[in-house]
Amino acid sequence: MPQQWPATDIARLILDGFDDYREHFRRITDGARERFEQARWQDTQTASAARINLYEEKVGETVARLREYFEPDTLMDVTCWPLVKSAYISIIDLRFDDELSETWYNSIFCSLFSHDLISDGCMFIHTTRPSLRRARAAQTRTYKPQGQISGMLASIFADYRFSEAYADLPGDLLRLEAQLRENLPDWVCKDPELSVELFSSVLYRNKGAYLVGRIYTNDDQWPLVIPLLHREGRGIQIDALITDEAEVSIIFSFTRSYFMVDVPVPAEFIGFLKRILPGKHIAELYTSIGFYKHGKSEFYRALINHLANTDDQFIMAPGVRGMVMSVFTLPGFNTVFKIIKDRFSPSKNVDRATVIEKYRLVKSVDRVGRMADTQEFADFRFPLSKFEPACLAELLEVAPSTVSLEGETVLIRHCWTERRMTPLNLYLDNANEAQVREALEDYGLAIKQLAAANIFPGDMLLKNFGVTRHGRVVFYDYDEICFLTEANFRHIPAPRTPEDEMASEPWYSIGPLDVFPEEFPPFLFADAAQRKLFDQLHGELYNADYWKGLQEAIRAGKVIDVFPYRRKGLDNE
């Protein structure tokens, strides 16, 4: 090993790239307040996509600089990279975003070297960061009502102000106080030790701003989220006060776009969120505020820890086998793993590259709470003993170019992970009458909200939707999605002759992007009762004019409101 091998220089250049990424990330994030105040909703969508793409762009730039500054024989000597890791640890020790900088280092290493060279000696498979920082207090503001809830609420909104005035602050405060008293037991509202703690920075996403914190006494606590809207021409409206943990969990769901929020010390804020949402894994919380790569790191660490400490084995996921993807899971780990088959069913008019493109598209669009977020992985290596034999046999049969056996190790060259849900078709098979109605209502609403966000699912079969633990219907099969404005919605032409009407084949031409909503009922529902109920609930989905109207609104630049919470006593404009 050369004595003067430039480990510190390489480490510093990697960290310089991270600093550049963080500066651009902060710049986009800090602009969220102004975009909200000025109601620049299309700019908000553009900024969200730009921030997601930023990470890979900056990784590419950093790798290019490394290749420019160091000779290949030096840079690519993997035996020396433990020295780079050691030097890197020493220069990130005083940072407030050190856990993110470890993930950045891993991304650079994986961009330079093949994944079979990954080891904890060369990169951060396990974090070296102290857990102490997560226990430190986040930057918050605390308010005590001291018997005057109305006065406390007034103090909160005296601190959280915008360049645009509140439209009706007195009326909003009266409504919030009523909601607070409705949501919490009377004894809590009268408790002299009652306190409200809010994170100092406002969270922004889509057309909303959110105050996030908790309400607590000496004995108990409740999460607290207060969403704000900007009603153009009228000002800022305080939209709701939410204290239900399940509802707050949905706001931070894996089906939502990422928040924009100023977090000087990310781990402190994540610790604060974890305190009010103990059921959320930190991987999901990091992802929810835009640090999706670090969320991926924390997910992987949780996965390898689960495999090391349980007897769980991979099995094929329940449900109808996919025509494009093969899906497997761990019973004790709330995730599915999706790989692309080598051969697709004949009815599928897509190829592997198109499928990859579709899944990556989902990362950058507004998922409006109706599409599961994904993480993409390359070169997963798992012990052979962790696979149920029938599962491994099926994977090797349907995707031999992706899954292979190397001694006692199973190599999965490429896969996506998604949150595991109950397939909607299986859910309906076991649901009572009320549950069927609720699920079909939400299924139609999911299709409508996706469409209004300019996403057409393509294949809308029940098996391609899942039901979350909160009972929400979510789309998760992306190989046929497209932008709604790309589809050509048509009415079925009237038959020209009696022979046309009796023909087994269409009497009209069909283009590759043509969609005939009148064909949906028998296509979506084999069960006649479910078909009839869905027609009552969402019959407009069978009319091409409904879809064309949405297309016109989207082309006119309208950005829809999709609320991740229930709204009380407000208009639904």
UniProtKB/Swiss-Prot annotation:
Q: Which UniProt keywords apply?
A: ATP-binding, Cytoplasm, Glyoxylate bypass, Hydrolase, Kinase, Nucleotide-binding, Protein phosphatase, Serine/threonine-protein kinase, Transferase, Tricarboxylic acid cycle
Please state the Enzyme Commission number of this protein: 2.7.11.5, 3.1.3.-
Write out the catalysed reaction.
L-seryl-[isocitrate dehydrogenase] + ATP = O-phospho-L-seryl-[isocitrate dehydrogenase] + ADP + H(+)
Query: What are this entry's molecular-function GO terms?
Result: [isocitrate dehydrogenase (NADP+)] kinase activity; AMP binding; ATP binding; phosphoprotein phosphatase activity; protein serine/threonine kinase activity
Record localization: Cytoplasm
Instruction: Report TM segments.
Output: none
Q: Which residues bind ATP?
A: 317-323, 338
Q: Where is the active site?
A: 373
* UniProt keyword Protein biosynthesis present: no
Pfam families assigned: AceK_kinase, AceK_regulatory
**Which BP terms does GO give this entry?**
glucose metabolic process; glyoxylate cycle; tricarboxylic acid cycle
* GO CC, alphabetical: cytoplasm
Q: Which domain of life is it from?
A: Bacteria
The main location class comes to cytoplasm
Q: Which family does it belong to?
A: Belongs to the AceK family.
Q: What does this protein do?
A: Bifunctional enzyme which can phosphorylate or dephosphorylate isocitrate dehydrogenase (IDH) on a specific serine residue. This is a regulatory mechanism which enables bacteria to bypass the Krebs cycle via the glyoxylate shunt in response to the source of carbon. When bacteria are grown on glucose, IDH is fully active and unphosphorylated, but when grown on acetate or ethanol, the activity of IDH declines drastically concomitant with its phosphorylation.
Protein's recorded name: Isocitrate dehydrogenase kinase/phosphatase
Q: Which organism is it from?
A: Pseudomonas fluorescens (strain Pf0-1)
- Gene behind the chain: aceK
